[in-house]
């Protein structure tokens, strides 16, 4: 089956190739005779294929020389499909067509009879692989072996060419004809005119060609150029022949003709030139071959994969084969005088015609209309069956060719004009080319192309007008064609009748062969006035511009491409109307019933003879059926004309695309192709669609597979599903498993760079496959979290500190010395051998002696590096060259210099080793300490007040955020510490005592006070007896004195003050009291007997008593409250609370920090002590002299004793200032192996501890808070009420914005927890039992302060603002004292609180009474103008109301009015008496029955009276009325 290739998007290379081997200097030689010679490039066993070329869409211009010939440049090479000589790329083959498979070509092996080429450069050039095009292209691969084809033996006789013998034709050549270049004409080429005795040898060689595949030489660009140059040189006097040959190649590239069509047209064109015809075999695909003799009258044998056929070039006008003069516009041979020779064309014999009729029946395809994007540049073709005289046919053919050249040049000029116009806008030019290529590839309607071009050139109307010239418009040309056809109709009538008779006689014999060879179909068309020469006399082609746009055709060839998803993009056959008449006899049919081919049997009824005749009369009524499937598109039937009727040119029919609209589908595929962006994936996508069209895939599978390609593009995928009619199935919602939430590890707590702690909600998840061991040992808390970092920077050595960097530099310097010393030593040994050899040489030997590179040794670079190191870089190269060229002179000098350098380098290395050793001793252990160097700066920031408060605040926020459900209990504390070892308390006190003793920041009295404060605080808080603390400190000081060697034990013992046992922390906190005790002790030496308590400031005593008194008088009393308070009392306390402010919290945090660090060191004490005792000297460190004795000399090394005690000793020396930091750190590094780095800042932390302890004494509010702690701590019993009162008292000494902390100590477990307390947090830990919770709530509710656990933002004012008296402010203060809120209150209200629901219930019969008369006010000023105005206004309003139509006075007579007036006067008198009786009420108030209070006292929420009471004045904010509506108060808020 024939395969036509087309590359719609191939871009021609404009780079011109190099000049041909046959240059212009060889053109002046005399042309030798071509008979009996073959050019060097003609190889009988080698061939290439004919690639495609799009003449207009891929090439911008077509240059021709002055003679009309196309220049032999890269354009000519592209016609044969070759890339430019400098390019390694393969020729462009169907890059954007549907055929996207790799194709190979297989040159045939070189036979022994093929003449060798004299041009070695051409024969030895690199291969130029080209795609195989032809019938066998689908069966060929790189590893296929070409089948040998035996060429038949012909007995050739001298033949005439156009009626002339070869001798005569040679004498009639033009005088100015140029000679064949020497590079083209081989000297030893065989003579083709001789008898074919050598043909048998060729056949024998062909049989063995299978074994000679490895000997063939693939062709390249130069071979094709040589052949083109040979054609051009052969027809130098007839440039039209050369141009027609190029046009044939263009037709093949544009898929207008196939490989047999090329063979047929080339054989006809080069008739009489057997060298060119046989040379063309070189470029044919496998299975094709042309064989001809030197006699042009002999038939030409064409070998194809279907078999061997014979083409007779000398046939009758009615036959299939015509002369070149008839086919090509009659280019006759001319003699030297330019006289044309008439062509003698005899009739074709019936035997020859019968052999060709078989093939012609197979190739009766519709006329193919090809288009290269712009105009249809096809000449009206003369039918082959018309016999026109030379004188008459020459002029029309020449005119037609001129028109072709003009039209083609106009198209080229138009494209160049567009490119020049939009030089600065290349996108427009590219878009224009894309429009043309899309028109060819996708068969778009011409209207759509014109619309796109109109939009593109909307700002260039001149270009748009020029483009309209190329649109199809065949009215004028059609008329001329009809007239021309009528002139020659009569002349051809007799020839047609004769040809019809011969064809009918041969028809029946060819029926069976037609069916067998039906599958081999080749498109037949004419181009530039050349018929296809297939025995199908076709009517004249329509004029230029009369072709419809390319549409889908129906051929077996295209149907096969459709199955392979390889539809040619723009080459589709159009329905053609083939003339039917006497000239149709070669098909073996009569005029009465013209049958259709097998591909159109389904359309037989539609194109019946009656309908065909109607279509002849009405050509415009022909409406081809549009269908996208191959084989279903009808082709215009042949026109059944009577022989006497002149065939007419049919009118242009409407394009098939006009009846269908595929714009949306085409747009979808364009978008899909751009979206996929990969040719291979797009091909797979098309294969899936093909499987669905073949019913291999169902709709669900199709959508599922297409989802892989288009699923991420919602628009395309939705359109596709709608187009194929896919309806999504409803999703099944049963058994949906709840997916676990995705956790953002960036928000979790980090441990190092790689681990994150999971929250509690994600840990300990239910797992049925775990046992107790799994729950115990498996990790559910920490997860690995990689750190994403770029690896583009490559590997960098990990150097963690500057000391490790120093070790790196030392090693690099030591390596450099070792490297050059060893290299120099090797070079010295090499040169010593050479110098010793030179000393034994004679003078002549020394002069001629030279050294090779490497100096005769294995290394080629060592001595060069050494010489360049000793000498500078520039002179080093000179020395190396001299050492190679003149070793006798250079070697001794260089050897002496190298020995001198060796001694110098070794001496310097010994000196540097001392420096390196000292540096390594200093930085060796520091380089291993990766945490200690950065810890000192980080620790300073972590122990600041801001950081410590931020730490506990952030922990509280995290705990609150992680509380998932409201029933989840609140966290008890934020920080927890354990103090298992009490001896460390004594160590901390000893370090603090050391610092206080040696510091100069405090005065001596403050130093003593600080020491006592620390001891008494630790004794009181941790429940340690003071005597034990004194004994421990005394023993510590004795150990220190013994170790220091000083005898001051008596002085220490004398300092023991007996009064310290009876002094309390309160005495220390009050400066004046402590100073009095200190002074009396110095005077008497004994404890003073204080007859009265120390004096305090009266304001302080009054404030404390007021707070305590208010706290003890709750606003609610009764059995319920007493029961809750009595059951909440705790006996034998084990848990103590310290409500602290910021200063106390910071002090305690420093204490815990020192304790944790000392505890960590003490826990590893046993192991470190054992290691020190068993530690041996490191051998390599000793050998390298890395061990230093400075620590032992300074007494800082650790011996085999208690390592923890030695750490304390060094710490005291550091605090005293006797030891430098670097030696203290170095000593800890060597003893604890970089694990004691937290003690590097022990002096700084101790200093901060003493600083904050001093703040506890100096800050007045902090001292009061500490006094409250002492008072609570000394109480043996406590209750929830006492703790709440304790908290309220502490809060009274703090500002509203200051933070409060609760430090809780458990005496039994020695555990301390710190909790950050907000305003609405509970004072104590939330009880677990419901009864305990209820009792705690009642206790807090009974106290006058806001109930704990109630958010303050939910509290509201317990009265309405509109009830406030005039002149009284909202906060309860009086603006005017003239108002008197006197009243009577009787309270017998009793309430109950439900333990579970906390609802408030009022008992029946209980009530509250509160009355206050509005007249109980001080008299106002009578002459007040404002008051008078208001009174008069009210009187006037009342009088108007009474006197109105509906008023009370309306129906009263005068007597009634007087009676009412009298009653009014009596009312006034009663009011006056009531005012006089107010004095008596005031006197009884003093006796307790009636009480007078100021309004400010009533509105003060802090003052409360005991309820229930018989008669009292109730404050407004605690007004509990009989309705029990207390929701507006804070109590009601908690109850509800």
From Swiss-Prot:
GO terms for MF: identical protein binding; transcription coactivator activity; transcription corepressor activity
Keyword set includes Amino-acid biosynthesis: no
Chain intervals with Basic and acidic residues compositional bias: 166-179, 1484-1495
Annotated keywords: Activator, Cell cycle, Cell division, Chromatin regulator, Nucleus, Phosphoprotein, Repeat, Repressor, Transcription, Transcription regulation
Modified residues (Phosphoserine): 137, 316, 1046
Entry function: Catalytic component of the RPD3 histone deacetylase complexes RPD3C(L) and RPD3C(S) responsible for the deacetylation of lysine residues on the N-terminal part of the core histones (H2A, H2B, H3 and H4). Histone deacetylation gives a tag for epigenetic repression and plays an important role in transcriptional regulation, cell cycle progression and developmental events. SIN3 also has a RPD3 independent function required for normal longevity.
Misc: Present with 1660 molecules/cell in log phase SD medium.
Protein name: Transcriptional regulatory protein SIN3
């Amino acid at each position: 089956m024939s395969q036509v290739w087309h590359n719609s998007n191939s871009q021609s290379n404009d780079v011109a190739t190099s000049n041909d081997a046959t240059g212009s200097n060889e053109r002046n030689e005399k042309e030798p005779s071509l008979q009996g010679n073959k050019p060097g490039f003609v190889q009988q066993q080698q061939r290439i294929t004919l690639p495609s070329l799009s003449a207009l869409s891929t090439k911008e211009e077509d240059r021709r020389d002055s003679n009309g010939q196309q220049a032999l440049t890269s354009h000519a090479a592209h016609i044969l499909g070759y890339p430019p000589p400098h390019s390694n790329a393969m020729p462009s083959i169907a890059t954007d067509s549907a055929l996207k498979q790799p194709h190979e070509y297989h040159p045939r092996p070189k036979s022994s009879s093929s003449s060798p080429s004299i041009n070695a450069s051409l024969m030895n050039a690199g291969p130029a692989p080209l795609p195989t095009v032809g019938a066998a292209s689908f069966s060929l691969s790189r590893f296929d072996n070409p089948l040998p084809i035996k060429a038949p033996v012909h007995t050739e006789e001298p033949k005439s060419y156009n009626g002339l013998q070869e001798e005569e034709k040679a004498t009639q050549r033009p005088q100015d004809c140029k000679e064949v270049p020497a590079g083209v004409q081989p000297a030893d080429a065989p003579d083709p005119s001789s008898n074919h005795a050598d043909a048998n040898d060729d056949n024998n060689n062909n049989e063995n060609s299978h074994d000679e595949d490895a000997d063939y030489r693939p062709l390249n660009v130069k071979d094709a150029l040589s052949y083109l140059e040979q054609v051009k040189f052969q027809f130098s006097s007839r440039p039209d022949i050369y141009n027609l040959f190029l046009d044939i190649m263009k037709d093949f590239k544009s898929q207008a003709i196939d490989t047999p069509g090329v063979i047929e047209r080339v054989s006809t064109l080069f008739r009489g030139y057997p060298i060119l015809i046989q040379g063309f075999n070189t470029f044919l695909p496998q299975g094709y071959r042309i064989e001809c003799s030197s006699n042009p009258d002999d038939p030409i044998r064409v070998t194809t994969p279907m078999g061997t056929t014979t083409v007779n070039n000398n046939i009758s006008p009615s036959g299939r084969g015509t002369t070149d003069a008839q086919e090509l516009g009659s280019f006759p041979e001319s003699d030297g005088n330019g006289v044309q020779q008439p062509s003698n064309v005899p009739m074709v014999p019936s035997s020859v015609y019968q052999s060709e009729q078989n093939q012609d029946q197979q190739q009766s395809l519709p006329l193919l209309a090809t288009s290269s994007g712009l105009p249809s540049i096809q000449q009206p073709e003369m039918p082959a069956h018309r016999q026109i005289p030379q004188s008459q046919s020459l002029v029309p053919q020449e005119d037609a060719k001129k028109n072709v050249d003009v039209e083609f040049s106009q198209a080229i000029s138009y494209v160049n004009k567009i490119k020049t116009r939009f030089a600065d806008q290349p996108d427009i030019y590219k878009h224009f080319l894309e429009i043309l290529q899309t028109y060819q590839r996708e068969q778009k309607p011409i209207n759509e192309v014109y619309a796109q071009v109109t939009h593109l050139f909307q700002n260039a109307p001149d270009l748009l007008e020029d483009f309209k010239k190329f649109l199809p418009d065949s009215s004028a040309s059609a008329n001329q064609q009809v007239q021309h056809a009528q002139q020659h109709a009569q002349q051809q009538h007799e020839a047609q009748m004769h040809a019809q008779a011969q064809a009918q006689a041969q028809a029946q014999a060819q029926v069976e062969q037609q069916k067998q060879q039906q599958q081999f179909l080749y498109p037949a068309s004419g181009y530039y006035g050349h018929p296809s020469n297939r025995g199908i006399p076709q009517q004249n082609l329509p004029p230029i511009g009369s072709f419809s746009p390319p549409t889908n055709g129906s051929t077996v060839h295209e149907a096969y491409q459709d199955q392979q998803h390889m539809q040619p993009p723009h080459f589709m056959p159009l329905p053609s109307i083939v003339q039917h008449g006497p000239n149709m006899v070669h098909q073996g049919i009569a005029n009465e019933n013209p049958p259709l081919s097998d591909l159109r049997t389904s359309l037989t009824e539609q194109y019946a003879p009656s309908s065909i005749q109607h279509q002849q009369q009405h050509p415009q009524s022909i409406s081809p059926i549009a269908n996208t499937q191959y084989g279903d598109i009808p082709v215009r039937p042949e026109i059944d004309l009577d022989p006497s009727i002149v065939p007419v040119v049919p009118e242009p029919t409407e394009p098939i695309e006009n009846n269908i609209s595929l714009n949306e589908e085409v747009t979808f595929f364009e978008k899909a192709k751009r979206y996929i962006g990969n040719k291979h994936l797009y091909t797979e996508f098309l294969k899936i669609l093909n499987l669905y069209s073949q019913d291999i895939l169902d709709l669900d599978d199709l959508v599922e597979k297409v989802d892989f390609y288009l699923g991420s593009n919602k628009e395309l995928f939705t359109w596709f599903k709608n187009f194929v009619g896919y309806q999504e199935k409803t999703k099944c919602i049963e058994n949906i498993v709840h997916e676990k939430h995705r956790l953002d590890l960036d928000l979790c707590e980090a441990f190092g760079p790689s681990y994150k702690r999971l929250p509690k909600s994600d840990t300990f998840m239910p797992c049925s496959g775990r046992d107790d061991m799994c729950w115990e040992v498996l990790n559910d808390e920490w997860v690995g979290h990689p750190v994403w970092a770029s690896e583009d920077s490559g590997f960098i050595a990990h150097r963690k500190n500057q000391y490790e960097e120093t070790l790196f530099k030392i090693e690099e310097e030591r390596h450099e010395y070792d490297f050059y010393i060893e290299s120099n030593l090797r070079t010295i040994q090499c040169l010593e051998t050479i110098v010793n050899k030179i000393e034994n040489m004679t003078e002549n030997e020394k002069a001629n002696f030279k050294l090779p590179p490497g100096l005769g040794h294995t290394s080629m670079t060592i001595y060069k590096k050494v010489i360049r190191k000793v000498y500078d870089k520039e002179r080093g190269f000179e020395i190396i060259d001299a050492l190679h060229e003149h070793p006798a002179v250079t070697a001794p000098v260089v050897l002496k210099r190298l020995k001198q350098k060796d001694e110098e380098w070794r001496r310097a290395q010994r000196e540097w080793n001392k420096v390196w050793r000292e540096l390594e001793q200093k930085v060796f252990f520091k380089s291993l300490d990766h945490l200690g160097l950065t810890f000192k700066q980080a620790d300073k920031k972590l122990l600041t007040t801001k950081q410590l408060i931020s730490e506990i605040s952030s922990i509280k926020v995290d705990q609150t955020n992680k509380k998932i459900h409201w029933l989840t209990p609140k966290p008890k504390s934020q920080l927890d510490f354990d103090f298992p070892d009490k001896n460390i308390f004594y160590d901390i006190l000893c370090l603090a005592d050391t610092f206080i003793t040696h510091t100069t920041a405090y005065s001596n009295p403050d130093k003593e006070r600080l020491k006592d404060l620390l001891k008494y605080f630790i004794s009181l808080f941790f429940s340690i007896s003071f005597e034990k603390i004194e004994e421990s400190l005394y023993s510590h000081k004795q150990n220190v004195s013994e170790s220091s060697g000083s005898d001051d034990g008596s002085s220490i013992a004398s300092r023991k003050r007996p009064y310290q046992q009876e002094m309390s922390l309160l005495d220390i906190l009050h400066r004046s009291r402590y100073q009095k005790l200190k002074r009396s002790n110095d005077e008497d030496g004994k404890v003073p007997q204080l007859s009265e308590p120390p004096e305090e400031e009266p304001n302080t005593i009054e404030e404390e008593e007021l707070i305590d008194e208010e706290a003890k008088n709750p606003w609610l009393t009764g059995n319920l409250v007493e029961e809750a308070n009595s059951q909440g009392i705790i006996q034998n306390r084990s848990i103590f609370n310290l409500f602290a402010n910021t200063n106390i919290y910071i002090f305690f945090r420093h204490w815990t920090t020192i304790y944790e660090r000392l505890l960590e060191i003490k826990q590893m004490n046993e192991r470190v002590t054992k290691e020190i005792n068993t530690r041996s000297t490191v051998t390599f460190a000793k050998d390298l002299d890395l061990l230093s004795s400075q620590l032992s000399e300074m007494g800082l090394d650790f011996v085999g004793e208690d390592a923890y005690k030695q750490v304390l000793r060094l710490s005291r020396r550091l605090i005293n200032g006797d030891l430098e930091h670097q030696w203290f750190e170095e000593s800890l590094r060597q003893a604890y192996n970089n694990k004691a780095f937290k003690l590097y800042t022990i002096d700084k932390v101790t200093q901060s501890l003493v600083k904050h302890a001093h703040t506890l004494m100096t800050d007045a509010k902090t001292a009061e808070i500490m006094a409250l702690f002492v008072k609570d701590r000394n109480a043996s019993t406590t209750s929830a009420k006492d703790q709440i009162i304790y908290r309220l008292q502490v809060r009274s000494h703090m500002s509203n914005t200051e933070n409060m902390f609760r430090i809780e100590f458990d005496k039994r477990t020695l555990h301390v927890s710190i909790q950050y307390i907000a305003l609405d947090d509970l004072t104590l830990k939330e009880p677990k039992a419901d009864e305990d919770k209820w009792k705690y709530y009642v206790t807090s509710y009974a106290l006058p302060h806001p109930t704990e656990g109630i958010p303050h933002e939910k509290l509201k004012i317990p009265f309405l603002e509109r009830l406030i008296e005039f002149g009284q402010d909202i906060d309860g203060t009086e603006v005017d004292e003239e108002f008197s809120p006197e009243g009577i209150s009787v309270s017998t209200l009793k309430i109950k609180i439900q333990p579970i629901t906390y609802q408030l219930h009022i008992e029946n019969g209980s009530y509250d009474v509160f009355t206050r008369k509005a007249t109980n006010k001080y008299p106002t000023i009578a002459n007040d103008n404002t008051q008078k105005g208001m009174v008069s206004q009210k009187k006037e309003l009342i009088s108007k109301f009474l006197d109105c139509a509906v008023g009370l006075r309306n129906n009263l007579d005068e007597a009634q009015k007087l009676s009412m007036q009298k009653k009014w006067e009596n009312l006034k008198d009663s009011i006056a008496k009531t005012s006089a009786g107010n004095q008596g009420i005031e006197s009884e108030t003093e006796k307790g029955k009636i009480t007078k209070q100021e309004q400010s006292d009533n509105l003060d929420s802090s003052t409360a009276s005991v309820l229930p009471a018989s008669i009292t004045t109730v404050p407004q904010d605690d007004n509990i009325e009989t309705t029990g509506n207390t929701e507006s108060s804070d109590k009601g808020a908690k109850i509800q």
